[in-house]
Amino acid sequence: MKVRVFTFFKIFSIIIIEDEKLKRIGNLWDKIISYDNLYLAYKKAREGRGHLESVKRFEQNIEGNLKQLQQSLINKTFSTSRYNTRIIYEPKKRVIYILPFFPDRILQHALMNIIAPIFHARFIKDTYACIPERGLHAGLVRANSYTQKNDYCLKMDVKKFYPSIHHETLYKIIERKIKDENVLWLINNIIHSFEGDRNCPIGNLTSQWFGNIYLTQLDYFIKQKLRAKYYIRYCDDFLIFSNDKMWLNQCREEITQFLDNVLKLKMSKCDLFPVSRGVDFLGYRYFKGYVLLRKRTARGIIRRLRKLYSEYDKGRIKPDKMLSHLSSVDGYISWANSYNFRQKIDLNNRISEVRKCLKIYRSIVISAQTIT
């Protein structure tokens, strides 16, 4: 099968591989800046953050602060705050950007409350990261299914994806769908809140969505132009399966060109191999007939459990929280053929012991409440 070379790469700085008959959407601004939407955004933004001083200060006058934020949007005086940064290693080094001003977070939720459904409707069914009602487990089920049906896999990874997102290209992609000038002003403000012409800060709610919106162009290119039947993407990692090794090799060349010329991205990893070698994806390794945990995943679980056991033995973690942690590990490894690993970490016995302790702990709490 010969894959056509697309000469329009040299003509257009950006293309959309979607149905061109789709209309641009307007009349969104009033919905975004409505008090009800801002209040809903505030409730979402405070989840898990109610203990922070910035949130507590904001909540001293919720209505007044929300109306002040609303007025800054009406007057177009709002500007995204400067970011604080934090470095994490999960598993590799990443720079996380944190907005110190709580209203910034509220604003991003307010924006996405309204525009997220518009873009969500355009996402293909086989992209899973940071999308409501989809997630890691749905992705691994699909990856396992595709492994069983094919002999070869093309695995590709975008190099430093979020730091490499091109601001102007992202804006043009969004502009092809949104025509409300006020909304575009706000989106442009967020996109260009980071100095330079690239980077979509990891840590922003909008970055999760912008990343998927950006790579939706790749999804449609692969599905519609290359006609890949077995394709799956999780963030910037993606797989294409086929029984035709030569066709996959041609796909690799076309995808590399598309990323370079249209999305202004570079490939980091690219591997074409038989699935009999095992398909490494989302923390698991898929073979025909069975699934294993990745070695790195297993090592990470062991490290995590050692830390949890240490904290639990010192009384720093209560039995109910410990049981929740162990149940999470149990659920995660249950997706793989993990009998030997489960025996190695003695998970079943640990869960049984914690359940007994939890029963005793609850009886003591109830007795204490009765006495009081």
Region roles according to the model:
Residues 1-67, 367-372:
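Non-catalytic, polymerase-adjacent accessory regions of viral genome-replication enzymes
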Residues 3-19, 24-28, 112-166:
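Active-site-proximal segment of RNA-dependent polymerases
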Residues 26, 36-39, 63, 67, ...:
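Non-catalytic, well-ordered alpha-helical scaffold segments
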Residues 41-44, 54-58, 80-87, 123-128, ...:
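Short coil/turn segments at secondary-structure boundaries
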Residues 48-57, 81-108, 122-134, 190-212:
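Short, conserved non-catalytic motifs in the polymerase core
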Residues 62-93:
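Active-site-flanking structural segment that lines cofactor/substrate pockets
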Residues 65, 72-73, 91, 125-126, ...:
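Conserved polymerase palm-domain catalytic core
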Residues 109, 249, 267-372:
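Right-hand nucleic-acid polymerase module
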